[in-house]
């Protein structure tokens, strides 16, 4: 009987130890799950911060290319070129290709024919990372980096502007803006942004690729992050190249 009681006691102790082991495993798993949940937002934030940094660097590279273009041709590129009938042909993004290490691609483009002509099909298929925000996954070749165009902007349709003509100051005048994906265009396309599109971005803040605003390239080559709720008067002043507008703090 003593041996039987001992066997039962040992069996009870074994089950107790097994039960404690499972409790320990479950506690450890619970801690691991909690840690994963706690660190996931931090990981996402770190990834988005890295993507925002790369987006900013893309625009800085574009700004440097615009100024290198100006150094060579003594004027900034037009927003787009036109044919003899005034039909848009090629974007400023195509014109600055030699200044973003894409000389060979530039040479393969027939500038006398439209950007979407079959003669330019090979270039059309080319994806250029410098024209793509890492926070966006657009269709191949699409870009959310659009020039600000209009009658009094720096990049004007079919007309080149010299730096001295930017009388409002290159540090207070927009060159390129980052729009939300629904306004994306092919990088070869002559389509760009205007004041109306910019003013409408505040109503589309939930679809912006960066929380709270968007990047802009100023004509001095600097990149700023504009708050989506920026005052309309400031935005209008930033668009103007020679309107003697007071931009103020932003």
Model-based region annotation:
Residues 16-47, 51:
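N-terminal single-pass transmembrane signal-anchor helix
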Residues 37-39, 48-250:
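Surface-exposed loop/linker segments characteristic of extracytoplasmic
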């Amino acid at each position: 009987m003593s041996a039987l009681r001992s066997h039962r006691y040992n069996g009870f102790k074994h089950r107790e130890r097994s039960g404690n082991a499972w409790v320990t495993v479950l506690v450890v798993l619970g801690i691991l799950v909690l840690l994963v949940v706690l660190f996931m937002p931090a990981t996402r934030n770190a990834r988005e911060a890295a993507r925002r940094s790369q987006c900013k660097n893309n625009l800085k590279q574009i700004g440097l290319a615009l100024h290198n273009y100006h150094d060579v041709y003594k004027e900034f590129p037009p927003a787009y070129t036109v044919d003899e009938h005034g039909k848009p042909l090629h974007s400023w993004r195509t014109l600055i290709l030699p200044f973003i290490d894409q000389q060979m691609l530039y040479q393969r483009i027939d500038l006398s024919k439209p950007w979407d002509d079959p003669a330019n099909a090979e270039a059309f298929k080319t994806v250029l990372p410098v024209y793509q925000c890492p926070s966006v996954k657009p269709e191949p070749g699409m870009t959310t980096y659009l020039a600000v165009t209009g009658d009094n902007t720096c990049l004007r349709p079919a007309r080149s502007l010299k730096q001295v003509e930017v009388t409002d100051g290159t540090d207070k005048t927009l060159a390129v803006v980052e729009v939300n994906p629904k306004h994306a265009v092919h990088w070869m396309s002559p389509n760009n942004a205007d004041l109306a599109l910019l003013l409408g971005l505040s109503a589309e803040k939930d679809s912006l690729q960066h929380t709270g605003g968007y990047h802009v390239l100023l004509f001095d080559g600097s990149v700023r992050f504009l708050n989506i709720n920026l005052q309309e008067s400031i935005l209008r002043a930033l668009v103007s190249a020679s309107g003697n507008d007071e931009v103020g703090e932003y």
